[in-house]
């Protein structure tokens, strides 16, 4: 943007338009421990210098506007403005830069992901001087994290509630996702839980449709899990999707789930919104409910490499807003997810402190100051042959969720659940004995299938199914 002539106004300020970089590009700035730091991938329009583009991002996502205004004199811009403090070119790309911006903490309302995102990823993403803009990472300071409740319970509390330790948890999304009656839906839930799964799940778009109203589904699923619990002696759960058209209706469904005594409910946090999600997370902590989070709509936001928001940012936001589980991709299944990048944000979900590691896409060290962790959920196009890789990639603190990989078993739902449970137990035992799951995985599954006809049948059905012929879109 070329500077225009400034005009001396009678009210005592210089009106006009001036380049953003004169105010918002400050390479000498030393970041504070209380600053929120952002790393943006910026693609400027032709002719726009990177310093001006970076400064424009800092300005338009904090205190700036397109022209000088006289009310600037009524506040301290130096105290409140965002600052572009560093710019680096993206290796292998022309006209693309990583721009680092520091935001003073006073710009943001305490405990509000909604407010944080409204500033940092608001109107600036439609700014004409930029061809594309992507938020790659955020550093959330401990002072701001301490204003959030975070996950309702966290990993250790969930394990204590379920009395399940030393292995990943197993789940299954009920299919077909739409069209079943409540009674048939409950039947499928019972069969999967009885067969050995820990959880079954409503799909993200199962809310309250004409073929199955929410209250009927809740009742039949509760009956199914109590019956499965009594027969297996294990604590079971079904993710009852409380997502609704209004926050009031969502809370009504969560209250009914609590009255049924079930252990867990579910929310679609991106389509439902962060305000609704945080409200539900607070209710779940106060009332002893676990909260499973689905990320429906995330790929609209995060899949393009040069524009949008990376999922690691959405994952951090979810940990702040609240959720005990969140879908995170599988690396090996049908959905997008490159290994190093996926493990980078999986660690951001689970660990208390994560070091900066650009090889995994982590731009800043992050200290969560004991905010509870979130279990990553691997789901989408996975089956028994993937079990060794999933166990090796995600470790014990995860949920491995097989929808078609359970319900597609040729002998039915319960045998499908048995096959997955046997495969998981075999992989965990082999790992504990010191065997290498990455190189010996297929051998471990074949050995286990010799004493489990259910697993043998599953191995035969899915022996040729792979999803590795497609390259990941989101790479470093």
Swiss-Prot record:
Residues modified to N6,N6,N6-trimethyllysine: 14
**Does this UniProt record's set of keywords contain Disulfide bond?**
yes
Please give an example of a GO cellular component term from this record. Answer: chloroplast
Q: Which cofactor does it need?
A: Mg(2+)
Q: Which residues carry this modification: N-acetylproline?
A: 3
Molecular-function GO terms, alphabetical: magnesium ion binding; monooxygenase activity; ribulose-bisphosphate carboxylase activity
Quote the InterPro entries the UniProt record gives: RuBisCO, RuBisCo_large_chain_AS, RuBisCO_lsu_C, RuBisCO_lsu_C_sf, RuBisCO_lsu_fd_N, RuBisCO_lsu_N_sf, RuBisCO_lsuI
Cellular compartments annotated: Plastid, Chloroplast
What keywords does the record list, in alphabetical order? Answer: Acetylation, Calvin cycle, Carbon dioxide fixation, Chloroplast, Disulfide bond, Lyase, Magnesium, Metal-binding, Methylation, Monooxygenase, Oxidoreductase, Photorespiration, Photosynthesis, Plastid
Gene Ontology biological process terms from the UniProt entry: photorespiration; reductive pentose-phosphate cycle
Q: Which residues carry this modification: N6-carboxylysine?
A: 201
Membrane-crossing segments per the record: none
Question: Mind telling me which residues form the propeptide?
Answer: 1-2
Q: Where does Mg(2+) bind?
A: 201, 203-204
Query: What's its catalytic activity?
Result: 2 (2R)-3-phosphoglycerate + 2 H(+) = D-ribulose 1,5-bisphosphate + CO2 + H2O; D-ribulose 1,5-bisphosphate + O2 = 2-phosphoglycolate + (2R)-3-phosphoglycerate + 2 H(+)
Residue positions annotated to bind substrate are 123, 173, 177, 295, 327, 379
Q: Which domain of life is it from?
A: Eukaryota
Residues the record marks as active site:
175, 294
Q: What is its EC number?
A: 4.1.1.39
Q: How is it modified after translation?
A: The disulfide bond which can form in the large chain dimeric partners within the hexadecamer appears to be associated with oxidative stress and protein turnover.
Q: How does it assemble?
A: Heterohexadecamer of 8 large chains and 8 small chains; disulfide-linked. The disulfide link is formed within the large subunit homodimers.
Q: Which PANTHER family match?
A: RIBULOSE BISPHOSPHATE CARBOXYLASE (PTHR42704), RIBULOSE BISPHOSPHATE CARBOXYLASE LARGE CHAIN (PTHR42704:SF15)
Q: What does this protein do?
A: RuBisCO catalyzes two reactions: the carboxylation of D-ribulose 1,5-bisphosphate, the primary event in carbon dioxide fixation, as well as the oxidative fragmentation of the pentose substrate in the photorespiration process. Both reactions occur simultaneously and in competition at the same active site.
Q: Which family does it belong to?
A: Belongs to the RuBisCO large chain family. Type I subfamily.
Further comment:
The basic functional RuBisCO is composed of a large chain homodimer in a 'head-to-tail' conformation. In form I RuBisCO this homodimer is arranged in a barrel-like tetramer with the small subunits forming a tetrameric 'cap' on each end of the 'barrel'.
Q: What is this protein called?
A: Ribulose bisphosphate carboxylase large chain
Species annotation: Liriodendron tulipifera (Tuliptree)
| Gene field | rbcL
């Amino acid at each position: 943007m070329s500077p225009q002539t400034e005009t001396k106004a009678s009210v005592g300020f210089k009106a006009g338009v001036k380049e953003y970089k004169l105010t918002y590009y400050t390479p000498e700035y030393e970041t504070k421990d209380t600053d929120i730091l952002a790393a943006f991938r910026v693609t400027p329009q032709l002719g726009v210098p990177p310093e001006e583009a970076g400064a424009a991002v800092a300005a338009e996502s904090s205190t700036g506007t397109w022209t000088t205004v006289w009310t600037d004199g009524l506040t301290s811009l130096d105290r409140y403005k965002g600052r572009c403090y560093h710019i680096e070119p993206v290796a292998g790309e022309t006209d693309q830069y990583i721009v680092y911006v520091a935001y003073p903490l006073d710009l943001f309302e305490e405990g509000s992901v909604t407010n944080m995102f409204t500033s940092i990823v608001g109107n600036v993403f439609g700014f004409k001087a930029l061809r594309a803009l992507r938020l790659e990472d955020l550093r959330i300071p401990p002072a701001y994290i301490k204003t959030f409740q975070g996950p309702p319970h966290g990993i250790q509390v969930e394990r204590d509630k379920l009395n399940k330790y030393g292995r990943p948890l197993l789940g299954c999304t009920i299919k077909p996702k739409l069209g079943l009656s409540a009674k048939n839906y409950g039947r499928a839930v019972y069969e999967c839980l009885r067969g050995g799964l820990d959880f079954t799940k409503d799909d993200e778009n199962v809310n309250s449709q004409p073929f199955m109203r929410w209250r009927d589904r809740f009742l039949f699923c509760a009956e199914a899990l109590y019956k499965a619990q009594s027969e297996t002696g294990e604590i079971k759960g079904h993710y009852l999707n409380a997502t609704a058209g209004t926050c009031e209706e969502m809370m009504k469904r969560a209250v009914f789930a609590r009255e049924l005594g079930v252990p867990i409910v579910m929310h679609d946090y991106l389509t439902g919104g962060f305000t609704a999600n945080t409200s539900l997370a607070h209710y779940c902590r106060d009332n002893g409910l676990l909260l499973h989070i689905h990320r429906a709509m995330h790929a609209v936001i995060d899949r393009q490499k040069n524009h949008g928001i990376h999922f690691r940012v959405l994952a951090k936001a979810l940990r702040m807003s609240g959720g005990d589980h969140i879908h995170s991709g599988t690396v090996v299944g049908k959905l997008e997810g490159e290994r190093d990048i996926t493990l980078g944000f999986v660690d951001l979900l689970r660990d208390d402190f994560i070091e900066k590691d650009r090889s995994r896409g982590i731009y800043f060290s992050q200290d969560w100051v004991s905010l509870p962790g979130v279990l990553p959920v691997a789901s989408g196009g996975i089956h028994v042959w993937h079990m060794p890789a999933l166990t090796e990639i995600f470790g014990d603190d995860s949920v491995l969720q097989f929808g078609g990989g359970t319900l597609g078993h040729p002998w039915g739902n319960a045998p499908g659940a048995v096959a997955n449970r046997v495969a998981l137990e075999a992989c965990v035992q082999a790992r504990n004995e010191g065997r290498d799951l990455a190189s010996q995985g297929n051998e471990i599954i074949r050995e286990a299938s010799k004493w489990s006809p259910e697993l043998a049948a599953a191995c035969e059905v899915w022996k040729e199914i792979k999803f590795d012929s497609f390259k990941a879109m989101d790479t470093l």
